[in-house]
Every structure is written in structure tokens, then in C-alpha cells.
């Protein structure tokens, strides 16, 4: 999914200050990690620059890298494709934690449709593409593969073990290993780095795959949504029990859009309060407010680098705003092949600093 979401003026100031801080030497108790997503997108054209970006990330020596999904733009959703991406993750010389986006399963189209989209289809392929947008075919999802089967394959390739990806994997706690109600959710991970709790949630773009014209997908989406909310709650419960200094949450979907929110959130929720992301937003908002310490939410999906506070709700003059402890980092995406180095220093009140990583 791609959209444009411009930086707000005050967010630009925030970025500037935090980038300067990120360049300073780290204290003994501090560490850094890297976040990226929506890359490498246009294959194989993007791969040389993606390889240089991986080298740049490795040179930064992060504790780990988080990839927030959309590992390609459009590609057949086959085990071969997934394993090819897995091989690229092996080029990172440190742990890689990956949470799925929409392009690698919810948006998976039949190969004939992909060829036509790419302009290399046969006459028959092009005819199928044209017919795919007619009402009966669109309503029946005829241009898609079995996306739930694709998700099963994706899980078997990327999440076969209770550990991260990358050439130097680290152990992870996974929701699917410890919660019998959500045993399929092996992609939801949690770990502790120097007193900061990290967690990933499987929340893709494309309406979180809530499909009112597909009963099986809608049921699976509702179950996954409940699992994500339970994982968010348990993450903050662990953070409170361990007196963690901060919490970092990572998922794929851009859950906010341009426009003012209301008393519930400062920015408008994508799809509205009752839409596919509303309950995830409210769970993060309320558990983060109760936690009271710095919380960082990382997402991709919109392909635009943003640092802001979309949860924050201003109060009356002289009153502190609500939910101002939640900062959001939205990572770069195609056509840019870039990442963000995040420094973590719990000796500072803001905890998080940000430094874009570029390659030619």
C-alpha cells in the first residue's frame, strides 16, 4: 500500500532534534536498532541498492533490525518467492525481526494478473486483468490466489522456529508458542533489550484483510485482530511487571490518515473508529496511557518517512495533552530504499532518537 502523508511542522523540528541526538556517542546503557519496510519493492531492479542498504545497516552495528513488511511490490506468493526473501534476510549480520505486510499475502494475485499488471502478459492475461475489475469477478475475488493458504506458507518459511531471522538469530517469545487460543500466531514476537520491551503485531494494510465479501477471510481477520489485542495487552503487562523503561511496538499498517481526529485520537483513524484498525489503535492508546512511560509505534505501508504523535489529544489551555507519551515512526518505502537507525537511551526523557540511513 502506498500513500502520501506529509510531515507536520512541529514533527520536522522533532526529527531535527532527534537526528542530532542520534549522532552523539551512545552511553554504556544505550543501544541502537534499525527499522525499515516496503522494500525491496520493484524486483529485480531494486536489489543492487537493497544490497548496498543492507551493507550500510550492517556497518551501523545495530542490536537488531525490524522489517515491518511488504517485502516486495508484486510477486507470485509462492514458497520459492518467500525463500528468496529469506535468503536476503540472511545477508544481515545480526538478528532480523519481520512482521508481515499486505503485499506478501492479503494482496496475492494470480500469476496471469501479475504478468498483465507488469505489462508482459499475453493477450489472454490482459483479458483476465480487464475482467477482474468487472463487478461479478471483483466481488468473487477471482483475481486472487487462496490468500489464507499463502499465509500458511509464509508462516512455515519465516516463522518455523522461536527465533529471529538474519545470519545471527536471537530467541523470541512468540504468541503462538504460549497461547493455545492463538496457536497460529507464530509471527507475533516479543523480546527485551536492556530494559525496553519490544513486540511485533501482525496488522497488514489493505484493510487488515477484513473482506465483507469473503467469509473465511473475515473470520480469520477477526481472530487475528483479537490475537493482536491480546498480545498488546500482555506486552504492556510484562512492561509494567518488569518496570521497563519503554515499549516499542512494530506492525505494518499505516493506521492514521490526514485529517483531525477527535477526543479519541489526535489524528483521524484510517477507516474510522469502527473500521479495520480502530480497536488496535484504541488498545495501543489505552494500555500505553496506563503504562505512562515512552512508547514508540513503528509502521510502514504509506512509503513516507514521518515522526509524529498521532494519538495525542490536546486539552484546554494550561492542561497536559492526553496520550503524548506515544511517538510514531513511519519508515521509508518504495521508490526510496532507505532505513532508519533508532537510538535508545533510557537516561534521557525522550528515550528515542532517529537517523535516516541512505544509499546511492
Model-based region annotation:
Residues 12-23:
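Bacterial N-terminal signal peptides
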